[in-house]
Amino acid sequence: MPERRIENSFFLSRTFLNPDGSAMEKSPEDTIAKLEQITGIKERRYIPETGDSVPLMRTACENALESWGQDKNLIDGIIVAHNAGNMLEGRQGFHTVPNMAALLKNSLGIENYDCFAYDILFGCPGWVQGVIQAHHSIQMGDAKNVLVVGVEVASRLVDPYDLDSMILADGCGVAIISADEVENQGGIISYATYSHAHDDVKAIYLDKSYNKEWSDPTLFKMNGKDVYKYATTWVPKVIMKALDKAGLTAGDVDMFLFHQANGKMLHAFAHNLAQMYGIEGLSLDGKIPVTIDFTGNTSVATIPTMLDLILKGKLAGYQIKPGMKVVFASVGAGMHCNALVYQF
């Protein structure tokens, strides 16, 4: 995660507007307090105001490679999940050419030209989908070690006049998926993916600022009620589908790593999933880690950064031990959602 911490007090000087451009009636203090109550967010991380997205990716990947302990040129696949490409310095927009995976491969100095490097645009579930694709590549014999990256620099994409700008944050998470996990019957047990893309296709989108004097048409926008309804309905269902494929139930799972959109949504995931299985509520303290209070919503980087915190013992009360079954589940723009059952 970036080192730059942004507390909620940072936004007290902001003028938040309604979609029609009128000023919100509540004071900034009351508005921010209400958002904190609903989302649970107290702070988030932003990258420095200088530079682009590449240093954030490179640092996260270098940390992953150091933990892996093998030659970086043994990486024969790179998949980068993101939402808007390389976010340029300041607010100069973003580039998708060359693609992020190519920029990352160049920055890391990986010389193996057999190492494919491509991006996926799949909203917040992009990193989980990247892990699924890496698994396929390994099963097909196309790769042995795939670097899967989820990167988000939302601080350059948000509308500063939109209250939702307080929710999103920056981050990058990385995992190296290797053939030995597949061969040893560890790693991915099962997975499921839904892509609806019906009336919900524009629940999350890019559009103009609520400040009519701004001309940038590529700022993050969200219909929060539609997103909440979709997520709380379909994430439990896609988890059940993945568990059914593995012959498991929610009671067999040791930990659930959910996309961290807001605290209220996490409780709804647990409640709805428990109802589907007819079991008592899943304890947020026991099986469902919460990081949104200090990370914000880092979109596609959420699950890998949360996993890293747990594996490194940096998230109090949570530990992943060998043999544990963990569900990764995410939801985002499209609308898409997915779930993956992983055995450590």
Predicted feature descriptions by range:
Residues D30-T31, V54-W68, M100-A102, Y230-K245, ...:
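Short, well-ordered amphipathic alpha-helical segments that serve as non-catalytic structural scaffolds
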Residues S67-D76, G109-C115, I138-V151, E183, ...:
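Structural signature of cysteine-dependent C-C bond-forming condensing enzymes
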Residues D216-I292:
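A contiguous, well-structured pocket-lining segment that forms one wall/lid of small-molecule binding clefts
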Residues A81-M87, L121-G126, G150-S155, Y194-S195, ...:
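Acidic, glycine-rich active-site loops and adjacent beta-strand->loop/helix elements
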